[in-house]
Amino acid sequence: MNFVEELRWRGMVHDMMPGTEELLAKEQVTAYVGIDPTADSLHIGHLCGVMILRHFQRCGHKPLALIGGATGMIGDPSGKSAERNLLDEETLRHNQACIKKQLAKFLDFESDAPNRAELVNNYDWMKEFTFLDFAREVGKHITVNYMMAKESVKKRLNGEARDGLSFTEFTYQLLQGYDFLHLYETKGCKLQMGGSDQWGNITTGTELIRRTNGGEAYALTCPLITKADGGKFGKTESGNIWLDPRYTSPYKFYQFWLNVSDADAERYIKIFTSLDKAEIDGLVAEHNEAPHLRVLQKRLAKEVTVMVHSEEDYNAAVDASNILFGNATSDALKKLDEDTLLAVFEGVPQFEISRDALVEGVKAVDLFVDNAAVFASKGEMRKLVQGGGVSLNKEKLAAFDQVITTADLLDEKYLLVQRGKKNYYLIIAK
């Protein structure tokens, strides 16, 4: 499998330094992608870089994932308009351990294969590096003129950012360049890959390698992922879509991919899955024949959810989706954990009632009219119940004066009332 050809048909090549393809064709190459450790989880904005490493390893090359422990203490000005908060070492080490666990779902770190993945942290070689070392070994090789010509620096100096550019952030490209030099000298790493906003920093590294010891190193970047409507990829109203289920439930993760547009689904299934070209072409053709069936979105959501979480989490997410949008049973509803239940019914009207009242038992008509205003009047509720239009926990309410007790609670805390086909209400017993 040819790595560059694989990336090309997937739409994952933005820029590539001349000679890169020839290098990859003649030998097993070691390459790295830098990962910002400012959180203890990756989010889907990291996934393109991670997938590039995954394809790289599948093509027989050796991937390095570089945790920017030192550079994460500073902040990269590329594409940013303000200084970043700096992290302490203990937090960075914790974040690194969490990130490695996530990367292990994509990369082989454990086998004896010569191209097994490695995780490195630039803090390990930068922590003993003095300012005098830096000035002598790095600073003297790169001119200020060269650094000022970088687009990320120009933008910050030309007034796009109110705070200007600190010296710390100005030197970031030299630190990233030194990472490349260090990995070139210690790991034989000849290629750095990243997002297109990293081109300037990566080429500073190739230039530093050339000027320091006459070595040849290469750069490859992928496009920054956008949405077809121009919106920012990977962000929702509630923030990032994280890979860690503590921050984004598998259900919400699955729903994100399921709800992308047709145009985005066709691009994303190439970028964020390992499906081959023939299978993707077949899925696209099938989707185009019947777009309303959302074949692409369903397969995309399945592949990414299984890869990031598990088959079990994927199946649970599908079951949870069917509860809201399909003809699910009360048994399926009872299987939901509390987080998924709340995620599925996020945004529906909620009412609080006293748990003590349920211990003795309460008539449904009193509970849903007097205690929680699901219905405007008892007459309205009686009429809907008689017409079969009211369900409690996905079971039709048999009588409007049916007695409800704590035994009916989901997760010992919730009652789900459905009025008609689409109106849901969540009652919380406290």
Curated annotation (Swiss-Prot):
GO aspect biological process, one term: tyrosyl-tRNA aminoacylation
Keywords on record: Aminoacyl-tRNA synthetase, ATP-binding, Cytoplasm, Ligase, Nucleotide-binding, Protein biosynthesis, RNA-binding
UniProt domain S4 RNA-binding: residue ranges: 362-429
Residues reported in the UniProt entry to bind ATP: 235
Broad class of enzyme this protein falls into: ligase
GO molecular function: ATP binding; RNA binding; tyrosine-tRNA ligase activity
Residue numbers binding L-tyrosine: 32, 172, 176
Span of the annotated motif 'KMSKS' region: 232-236
Similarity remark: Belongs to the class-I aminoacyl-tRNA synthetase family. TyrS type 1 subfamily.
Free-text function comment from the UniProt entry: Catalyzes the attachment of tyrosine to tRNA(Tyr) in a two-step reaction: tyrosine is first activated by ATP to form Tyr-AMP and then transferred to the acceptor end of tRNA(Tyr).
Record protein name field: Tyrosine--tRNA ligase
Lineage, broadest ranks: Bacteria, Pseudomonadati, Bacteroidota, Bacteroidia, Bacteroidales
Encoding gene per record: tyrS
